[in-house]
Amino acid sequence: MSRSTGNPSPRKPYTPNPSTPAPSLPNPSTWEPRPAARWEDAFLSGNGHHGAMVHGDPADDRVIVNHHTLVRPNGSEDLRPPELAGELGPLQDALLSGNTRAAERFGAGSPLVWVQPFHPAFQTRVRRAPAESGTPLGAGAGAHGTAHAGAGPEAEYTAPAGTATGPSYRRELDFTSGETVASHGPWRSRVFVSRADDVIVQHITGPAADTEVWLDPVLPGAPANLAVGRSTVLTPQGARIALRLRYPESDLSCTGVSVLRAEGGTVSVSGDGVRVAGARSLLLLTRVRRSPGEPDLDAEWAALPDDDYDALMARHLPLHRSAFGRCALTLHDEDPARQGLPGSELLRHPGSPALLERLFAAGRYHVLSASGALPPRLTGVWTGDWDTAWSGAFTTNANLNLQVASATAGNLPEVLDAHARLIEGQLDHWRENARALFGARGIVAPSHSDGESGRTRHFQRAYPLHLWTAGADWLLHPLCEQAQCRGAAPEALVSACAEVADFYTDFLTREGPDGAVAIVPSYSPENRPENASWGTLNATMDIAAARHALTTAAELAPAHPDADRWRDLAGRLPRYRINADGALAEWAWPGLRETYDHRHLSHLYPVWPLDEINPYDTPGLAAAAHRALELRGSENDSAHGHLHHALVAARLRDGARVSAALASVLDGDFFHDSLMSAHYPDRNVYNADAAHALPAVVLEMLVQSAPGRLVLLPALPAAYPRGALRGVRTRFGAVLDLVWTPEEITASLRPTRDARIELRTGPPPGSPAGPAEPGEASWVTLTAGADRVLTLRRRATGGR
């Protein structure tokens, strides 16, 4: 997959207008002084089902419509994993006997088939009619009335002549409501995606002018043979508009339906849509769905709500605001004026507390808005291009978990409920993977999913993702953390954990020369030893996943008849290995040499998020893990690699390394004006990893919790000496508010159950760079329902 989606233009500097007062910015929100010229810069709204990308152009108000279920059929839908279990024994023999390339034959010849690619639906367009008002839609520039939609020069958007920008133009996104507002003089456009009614709501007011409204399928990368069907019906209130896009060589289609209501004026059919003359305001309600056969348009139109904008917002707002507002960050910035800057200008101040505060709020907003029917994809729930990198899929071996990593501490159960929905909908496919590939009971997760299929089908010599057996434990772990916060695990989670343990019981039947269980074949995403092929033995991530899966299943289901067997098997797993460089080795097998320059940090799974290796209980292994982090390169500068590095560094109490990893992203031009992110520097490849993972880094550097431990400011970068964090959920059942200065920490705890916790703090200001010593611990007893306020001096011992 190419890295490039087109080079973004250099950002235009923001010059405040001296004749107008400085804009106020209600926090948390962001704004821009000009419309979005690129879809990547469009402001985003979403409810976890629908997504909207809002450009805010007064001359041609465009909203790209997305939906989590929109994936293009490509022949992969019904493919099953190949039957390779019969080849497993000979492969294990070969690897154990020293054949370092034997795994390349396991699945060789199986085709590499990408999952169904995620794609946009269409864009709603509300365009001021040309001066020659008799020109019908489809005949003017930018209108397309052809029978097929396709990529071509017309798919690239150019702002119409006369597009208004300047001191009176402003577009804003309010994170607390999910509403985008664009205004220019008396013209105003408001858009949000309703959580209550599952509909995209667009309301435009302004001078009565001729306006053209239609659903436009022409977007970059659209298939040339995408069949387009349209329907327009006038109503007393306005019009009903529909657009059906039938996928090539498929009975499936995505169908968009809109209801237009005009206040005053007249509405007439024109070309591919309608022309509105003299209306004071327009309300456009839009939905899209993917389905086989012919949709019942009358039923789809009738199902849209019959309410005005304010009533729709009144139903939506409590649902969104209560979720977003549970957790909030405030950072002290020496220059208060930075708080009011446009996002594009604030990004020019990468070291400022104001930027980190806004990106924390934006990331929290975006991950919430992308989570509902499913968790966030590689692009959240948004894209403006049919050619999405890596199919816009769920990449599970790193990216998905990084994106949802803030949900537990950040008190966003909606995100983890969506994550659980993805898993529960695929368990049958995971069982197929375990049986077909390994001849085992239980479940094995794939490395890629389109949201429909969970079958393993990625077979590639340099990316043998079918050998990755740690995926089920890795993906279930966020749900295990959520269960710790709640104090109980749901039955579905207990059952899934038991199935992971069943897989390991059947799979882990071989031993190494030391008598310990050998994990063979084994794969450390997406790296290889310097002196062996990708498929090998005893990847550290696999060891950690197997141990965690077996012990967790036994803890959650102590009465299970195999619980003792699971504990025994966990006890026979190999120990972690420390290599000649003093680093935690990526493979715990004699003779395998490290490859340090890589974007993934799979072998540090026992540090983050498992907390099996930490500075308090396992200081020797923590030091080795820190050495491994020091030696790790960033390879191709992927955003997820930098932020994964920061998460591990925070667990190891290294604030300077957290700061450096954040700087790699904030200095690297990874963020679009929308505050959605890119996969690579210079805003290359639209991707949500950085935007969604950054709040997790902030939370980890400020607060860490385990069932019996609380660590305050474990890895605070020096750039943020003062601040406040509200609404953090801890894994011992309390909600935490935190305020800190260079001299003092105040922690307010609201426990929901009794607990006795070990309390530690991070290093005081001015401490040398590197991993801080764990310091002394104190103990705090919490009683359910009894709030507790702790005030601690920031001193070197880390005590109370």
Where are these regions (language model features)?
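Compositionally biased, intrinsically disordered low-complexity segments enriched in Pro/Arg/Gln/His
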Residues: P8-P10
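Alpha-helical packing segments of well-folded alpha/beta enzyme cores
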Residues: H316-A323, L359-A362, H366, H419, ...
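Aromatic-residue-lined binding/catalytic grooves and analogous aromatic/hydrophobic interfacial grooves
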Residues: P13, P21-G145, P153-Y463, C485, ...
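Active-site neighborhood of glycoside hydrolase catalytic domains
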Residues: T469-A501, D514-R528, T536, T540-N579, ...
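C-terminal capping/lid segments that line or modulate ligand- or cofactor-binding pockets
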Residues: E40-L70, P90, F394-E414, T509-E511, ...
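C-terminal accessory segments of proteins
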Residues: H448-L479, W534
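Hydrophobic (often cysteine-bearing) scaffold residues that line and stabilize catalytic clefts
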Residues: L356-L359, N399, G471, L493, ...
